[in-house]
């Protein structure tokens, strides 16, 4: 529907709590590569506005962080950026101090 009604519009989706296999939980490590690649293609290559408005270089930049944990940045101008965070990695059951944890990697990325 988005492609039909907004073919020339940049659409920047983010994950909600019911957008993964197990509601309110991030993607399990064993499913991560397949899931994020599938969603990346839907959101950034198949939505016509995104495919038209984002350069290949920008899509590659988005894909690097998106594949790591479903988060990304889009620079609209040299002074305005959109940060799309995947907050499913932040709950009371996850240890944020585990090296390689997607939530910690996202925070490290955000600090840069």
PLM regions: where:
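Extended active-site neighborhood of metal-dependent phosphoesterases/phosphodiesterases
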Residues: 2-109
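Short acidic, glycine-rich surface-loop motifs adjacent to enzyme active sites
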Residues: 112
């Amino acid at each position: 529907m988005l492609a039909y009604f907004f073919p020339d519009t940049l659409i920047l989706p983010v994950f909600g709590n019911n957008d993964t296999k197990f509601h309110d939980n991030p993607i399990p490590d064993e499913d991560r590569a397949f899931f994020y690649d599938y969603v990346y293609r839907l959101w950034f290559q198949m939505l016509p506005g995104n495919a038209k408005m984002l350069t290949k270089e920008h899509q590659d930049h988005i894909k690097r962080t998106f594949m790591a944990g479903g988060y990304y940045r889009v620079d609209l101008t040299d002074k305005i950026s959109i940060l799309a965070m995947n907050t499913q990695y932040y709950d009371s059951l996850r240890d944020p101090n585990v090296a390689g944890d997607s939530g910690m990697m996202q925070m490290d990325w955000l600090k840069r």
